[in-house]
């Protein structure tokens, strides 16, 4: 049988290409990560109050929602109404994205196991590919009787496994700097950790982002200045941004 050269390209079987990187959609961030986060990974984002952690997470989810990657936000302390208002400051219509099935904002349940189940159920309902937990300290402190100190690490590991395996998501886990250091979570976060800090320079408080750890990615090892602008979280990258990169195995 001779091959028909007139067969249209669309009729030819195409090999499915699986994209291994997830673009954050945050200006400057993906340039520091060789294109984005590793798909189906969990990354810890830590910083003090007012550093912009929630904005970072929202921007990550909004970008995904607008690019066929629905997302889940588990918000422990902020209500939907508060989040809607926060998003509106940057032109993000979170309520519309929710109604469109591109975003789901869920609250903690009465038990930790029920919260895990709600994450799994919601991810299947909307076909989620992204998730943000805001925040880990608030989540765990919500269950003082269920999660004792010795149970925090296995509870955290379970959360990571559920997000990446059961939920099939690439997740950002938000934490407070002091709390994260106290429990040394960076030692067993599966993929990476990003830290937000501030410094006084010439009498002005400047904000900096540092990728402290990101396995399987050649990433910047420098601190990078960032600001919260009308467009959201913006990272400034110097022209010589390729310097100071290393391959983390």
Feature map (PLM): residue ranges:
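C-terminal regions of RecA-like/P-loop NTPase motor modules
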Residues: 2-19, 220-249
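Pre-Walker A adenine-sensing motif
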Residues: 24-36
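Conserved P-loop
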Residues: 43-44, 48-114
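Loop/turn-to-beta-strand initiation segments
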Residues: 70, 102, 127-130, 166-173
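Conserved nucleotide-binding/hydrolysis micro-motifs of P-loop NTPases
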Residues: 77-81, 109-113, 137-139, 177-181, ...
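Phosphate-binding/switch loop-helix module in NTP-utilizing enzymes
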Residues: 107-165
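Phosphate-binding/switch region of NTP-binding enzymes
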Residues: 170-232
């Amino acid at each position: 049988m001779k091959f028909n050269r007139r067969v249209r390209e669309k009729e030819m079987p195409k090999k499915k290409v699986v994209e291994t990187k997830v673009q954050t959609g945050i200006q400057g961030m993906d340039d520091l990560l060789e294109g984005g986060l590793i798909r189906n990974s969990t990354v810890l984002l830590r910083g003090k109050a007012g550093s912009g952690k929630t904005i970072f997470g929202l921007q990550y989810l909004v970008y995904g929602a607008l690019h066929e990657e629905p997302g889940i936000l588990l918000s422990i302390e902020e209500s939907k109404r508060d989040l809607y208002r926060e998003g509106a400051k940057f032109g993000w219509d979170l309520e519309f994205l929710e109604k469109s099935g591109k975003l789901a904002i869920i609250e903690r349940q009465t038990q930790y196991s029920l919260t895990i189940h709600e994450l799994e159920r919601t991810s299947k309902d909307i076909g989620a590919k992204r998730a943000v937990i805001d925040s880990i300290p608030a989540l765990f402190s919500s269950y003082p009787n269920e999660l004792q100190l010795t149970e925090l690490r296995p509870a955290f590991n379970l959360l990571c496994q559920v997000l990446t395996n059961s939920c099939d998501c690439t997740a950002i886990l938000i934490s407070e700097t002091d709390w994260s250091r106290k429990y040394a979570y960076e030692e067993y976060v599966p993929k990476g950790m990003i830290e937000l800090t501030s410094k006084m320079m010439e009498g002005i408080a400047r904000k900096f982002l540092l990728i402290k750890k990101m396995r399987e990615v050649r990433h910047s090892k420098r601190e990078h200045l960032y600001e919260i602008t009308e467009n959201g979280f913006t990272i400034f990258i110097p022209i010589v941004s390729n310097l100071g990169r290393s391959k983390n195995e």
